[in-house]
Amino acid sequence: MTAKATLLVLALVVMATSGVSSASVAGGPVVNSDTVSRSDPERLSTRGCVANCQANQTGIDCIKYCGIGIGRRDITQQ
């Protein structure tokens, strides 16, 4: 992966995780269970995240709420 592509992916991940605490961005996406459980309990489950990824085609919901691999793969393919 070129440096430009790496920066683009990092920028997308930062944008996708902007609603999450800044500490989680440095170490990768981390679930803030308090926020997620109040907004949408289904997103706490892997099945819910996969369904959101498939529905949105971007995987941003997966990264923001669960940080699972399918979301990262979808973003790098854009």
From Swiss-Prot:
Q: Where is the signal peptide?
A: 1-22
Positions of the propeptide removed during maturation: 23-47, 74-78
Question: Would you say which domain of life the source belongs to?
Answer: Eukaryota
Q: How is it modified after translation?
A: Contains 2 disulfide bonds.
Spell out the subcellular localization from the entry.
Secreted
Question: What tissues express this gene product?
Answer: Expressed by the venom duct.
Q: How does the entry describe the domains?
A: The cysteine framework is XIV (C-C-C-C).
The entry's protein name is Conotoxin Cl14.9
Q: What high-level taxonomic lineage is stated for the organism?
A: Eukaryota, Metazoa, Spiralia, Lophotrochozoa, Mollusca
